[in-house]
Amino acid sequence: LQYVTLYGIFYAYEIIFYSGGIILEKLVITGPTPLKGEVEISGAKNAAVALLPATLLIDGVCTITNVPNISDVQILCKILGEMGAKIDWTGKNELKIDTTNITTTQAPLDLTSKFRASYYLIGAMLGRTGKIEVGMPGGCNLGARPIDQHIKGFELLGANVEVGKGTISAKASCLKGAHIYMDVVSVGATINIILASVLAKGTTTIDNAAKEPHIVDVANFLNTMGADIRGAGTDVIKINGVEKLHGNATYSVVPDQ
């Protein structure tokens, strides 16, 4: 039995070893001991990695605060930079992003293949230009971690999606609103369909949508820039397409949960 005092609280924890490895770790907390003080809560990673691609939909500059400076965010910044965006860290956790001059519809394949959330570039670029190619997000196995709900949503909006050897490409001459029923509740697909629908013609309804806080955060961010998204945080989300999103706004990433 091991003992430790942390922030004025007495902890006892027991580690049981079996065959040379730890199979169980147990914490026993003895209280009450009053707590006091402050901690800084970082911005939510799952929101940040969706908000950065969402800036591709904006006509202008935006500032995002409370951005966690983690590897996935750093890779996304590099991807957006190589696509033509101007990105500056203007504070400890503050990014100024200008996506006015995006110069390519092919995201760096080597970088997008490094982490799964790069698939948000597909929805955002379909909305912006109607065309995008990325490396297979995170090197994911389509059987083990399917993105079929993403593809289903894009195709119902009017896009043609092709999965190649290590790449995904999508293009559409005109995205049009549609009713999309999610066969499986998917956070990533819900956000991706929102991104693709914001500038589409007409109304898109996502039925059986995921309801996580970072979905609400993405919707709030886009609405701040002029989108018309309703119902985020419920299982039915409606997106009324608008002509464009404006920049010149500041938004803070929701704190981590």
For each of these PLM feature ranges, what is it?
Residues Q2-Q257:
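Structural preference for solvent-exposed beta-strand-turn elements
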